[in-house]
Amino acid sequence: MTDIKSMTIDELKELMTTLGDKPFRAKQIYSWLHEHLVTSYDEMTNLSKSLREKLKEYPVTALKMVDVQTSRIDGTQKYLFRLSDGNVIESVLMRYKHGNSVCISSQVGCRMGCRFCASTIGGLTRCLLPSEMLDQIYRIQALTGERVSNVVVMGTGEPLDNYENLLRFIHILTEDGGLHISQRNLTVSTCGLVPKIYDLAKEKLQMTLALSLHAPNDVKRRELMPIANKYSMDEVLEACRYYFKETGRRITFEYSLVAGVNDSDEDARELSGRIRDMNCHVNLIPVNPIKERSFVRSTRQAVENFKIKLEKYGINVTIRREMGSDIDGACGQLRKSYMEKTESEK
């Protein structure tokens, strides 16, 4: 099946030629799909009825909302969407003074196996299509009536493990004729797929790369992240340096603090020594507890002390603001709870 919502304007022009219609119709269809966010050809009122009938051979797929949870604390909303094949994914809308940010999933499940993450429990089911990544943003914008200005690809899945679809998603999201979200308002996370970081750098996109570091050395990183058995910290950091060299975009290092594992003064000193020469920013994240893991989040004082130590060594650092802490806010937890409930009801 042709996924029309994943097609570029040039590909739509080719489709128009195939259907015996004018190429300029491609921009009209593209605008309906990606700017006006329609989900039916019948809504494309400037197209002829005959063209709309022909296009119905190429269904416009749309996510269906299964559940939404709203935080009473800050208005953060966590959405559970069903895909056309019955799989479910989750997305998060976070409201800030500077605008609305949506965190999207890039895969159904994840195969990276990071030990503190709920998303990877159960492994990888499949990669998301560009249209399925886009539609998380489109559905949330349509449901709320509020414009999305920032997008973070930090939900379930490893974005660089879905590389080609990710690039197409970015192209459509940031292009004229659609939502036209600035590349500078886009952040993509990775656990450290080194070859793909180099590939992404060569694209020279103006987005932020967020590297999930979570440890000051290889020994501790291997305990937390299986990917560290394949790529050393030196290799990962060198790839990040290359990304900055090619794009001029400062690297963000995500660092989840686990009590007694990676939150000591020595950890802060060692980490700063590894990244002090880099144009970077460290985002400290108190780890979210999940029942399948024994990890305990660092105390508030330990997090603050770690921040102070890094600042002492000249590192730019912030503590991530916790959004939606009264709902299943941790990545993968709403989907996991839903799947467990569905399984128990069988």
Whereabouts are the PLM-identified features?
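Generic beta-strand structural signal
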Residues: 77, 89, 100-104, 112, ...
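Conserved AdoMet/S-adenosylmethionine-binding subsite of the radical SAM
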Residues: 141-150, 155-313, 317
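Short linear Ser/Thr-Pro motifs
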Residues: 71, 105-106, 119, 189, ...
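Auxiliary Fe-S-binding modules of radical SAM enzymes
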Residues: 1-89, 241-250, 255-346
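Conserved alpha-helical substructure of the radical SAM core
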Residues: 120-150
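P-loop NTP-binding catalytic core
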Residues: 85-99
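Canonical Radical SAM [4Fe-4S] cluster-binding loop centered on the CxxxCxxC motif
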Residues: 95-132
